[in-house]
Every structure is written in C-alpha cells, then in structure tokens.
Amino acid sequence: MPELPEVEVTRQGIAPHLVEQTVVDLIVRNASLRWPVPELAKQIIGQTIRQVRRRAKYLLIDTDAGTSIVHLGMSGSLRILPHDTPVEKHDHIDLVLANGRILRFNDPRRFGAWLWCQLPEEAHPLLEKLGPEPLTDAFNVNQLAAALAGKKKAIKLCLMDNHIVVGVGNIYANEALFAAGIHPEAEAGKIDIERLTVLVAEVKQILAHAIKQGGTTLKDFTNAEGKPGYFAQKLHVYGRGGETCTQCGNLLSEIRLGQRTTVFCGICQTR
C-alpha cells in the first residue's frame, strides 16, 4: 500500500502539470472503487485547478468549486499522460485538461477512491479526526507524549494510529522503531520522554529520506512518471524477517502485531 512518502512523491510529480490548468472532461470508466465515484462532471468540468495538496495519505485537488479527494488504496497510481494514450486494463478515471494532457487513475485492486468535497476539507468525515502531519512542527515529543499517556497498547500500533500521527504506515513504523531502538511491543504509555524524543526525530528523518528517494516500491508503487521508488534498498528491518540485523548481526524476529507483519531486532530494540 502506498504510504505517506509515496503519496507525497505522487503529489510532487503531478502538481506542476495540474496547477492553473482547466478541466475539460472527466472520464469515469469504472465507478466501483472503494466507495462509488460520485457524479463529478458537472462540478469539475470548466474548473481551474488551484493547488494539489496532501493530507495524510489523501491527495486533495482544489478548484474554486470544491476539492477532489483521491486515495491510492492498495495498488493505485496517478500518472500524467498525453490525452491520446491508449487505455489499459484498470485505467478507471481520466481527468482531461485543456492543455492536451490527462491525469489517469489506475487501480488494479480497486481499493482506491475518488471523492468530492464542497465543505472545508477539514470537515470531511475522512479528514476531520486525523492527527498531525509527521513532517510538521505539530508532531513533536510533547504532542506524542500527551497522546500516549496511559496507553497500554504496543507502541507500533499507536505509531500507526492516524488519530495520533498520520501517514506512518507499516513500512515506516518498523523502520523508525528500529532506528530509535524501541521494541515494537513496548507499552506506549511507559516509554520515557528521552526515547520518545529520539522516536519523533527518526520518524521525521526516515519519512523525509523516503520522499527524497522517491518512496518505497515493493510491488505496485510507481510515481507520476511510472518509475519506481528506491527507498526499499535502504530498509533495515521491514521485509527482512529471519535475516541478520544490520547493526549487531542477530537474526531479526518476525511477528504479527495488529494483523500486520512486524520485524525487529531483539538485541537492538528494547522495551
């Protein structure tokens, strides 16, 4: 599943081609995504795209009439293409621009979404209760400590909770906890402020580095140009269960935590 870095890489790739362009058509070939695609043509045709933003793992395409909320789901991608590019299987939506380009949404597994919001996006049900962005000052050790106070849940589950901080999915939660030396099953409310300070710094550094590397390509992710990301080459624990730790040489352990694969070093990461 594309996580925050992959969605941000997509945003950076499509934004220069969309901003200040006028929409001349919207072609929906398959409206049966995670949620049915609403009738958008009347709202969006003729509108000029003002900006392309990201909130958590959602892309927000703003016009004066409202905002398209796009989620890539498990396998979705957005690409900028010439308008006459042949349609392939799983090409579900084309946003057609006046400059002869299209924004094409491809999603083999159809867990993605393309919705419409005329409210301030902060009031949309999908967005209104989200926590702070991890790469902003709003995500800091004081905020995290307050959010974790009294919690008995495993720290990894809390780190992946979008009400606490957005966008830290399974890949980057594994990597950040390894970098911070914190066991993924450590009781969140008992982690001291010094270790939380390190964890916040590692989350920020790892996400920023992943964005710089173009995201992580494991199976499906490609950027707006159809190219893979390269952060997978730098993963220390995710997907490496049973292999040797890059720091101490111990074999990495693999467990299921919150129904997600969790990999850690029992020597380097402590409770």
Curated annotation (Swiss-Prot):
Its cofactor is Zn(2+). Keywords: DNA damage, DNA repair, DNA-binding, Glycosidase, Hydrolase, Lyase, Metal-binding, Multifunctional enzyme, Zinc, Zinc-finger. DNA binds at residues 90, 109, 151. HAMAP family: Fapy_DNA_glycosyl. A zinc finger (FPG-type) spans 236-270. Binds 1 zinc ion per subunit. It comes from the Bacteria. GO terms for biological process: base-excision repair. The keyword Hydrolase applies. Gene3D superfamilies: 1.10.8.50, MutM-like, N-terminal. This is Formamidopyrimidine-DNA glycosylase. One of its GO terms (molecular function) is damaged DNA binding. It holds the Pfam family H2TH. PANTHER family: FORMAMIDOPYRIMIDINE-DNA GLYCOSYLASE (PTHR22993:SF9). Belongs to the FPG family. The active site is at residues 2-3, 57, 260. It catalyses: Hydrolysis of DNA containing ring-opened 7-methylguanine residues, releasing 2,6-diamino-4-hydroxy-5-(N-methyl)formamidopyrimidine; 2'-deoxyribonucleotide-(2'-deoxyribose 5'-phosphate)-2'-deoxyribonucleotide-DNA = a 3'-end 2'-deoxyribonucleotide-(2,3-dehydro-2,3-deoxyribose 5'-phosphate)-DNA + a 5'-end 5'-phospho-2'-deoxyribonucleoside-DNA + H(+). Its EC number is 3.2.2.23, 4.2.99.18. Involved in base excision repair of DNA damaged by oxidation or by mutagenic agents. Acts as a DNA glycosylase that recognizes and removes damaged bases. Has a preference for oxidized purines, such as 7,8-dihydro-8-oxoguanine (8-oxoG). Has AP (apurinic/apyrimidinic) lyase activity and introduces nicks in the DNA strand. Cleaves the DNA backbone by beta-delta elimination to generate a single-strand break at the site of the removed base with both 3'- and 5'-phosphates. The lineage of its organism: Bacteria, Pseudomonadati, Pseudomonadota, Gammaproteobacteria, Alteromonadales. The gene is mutM. Monomer.
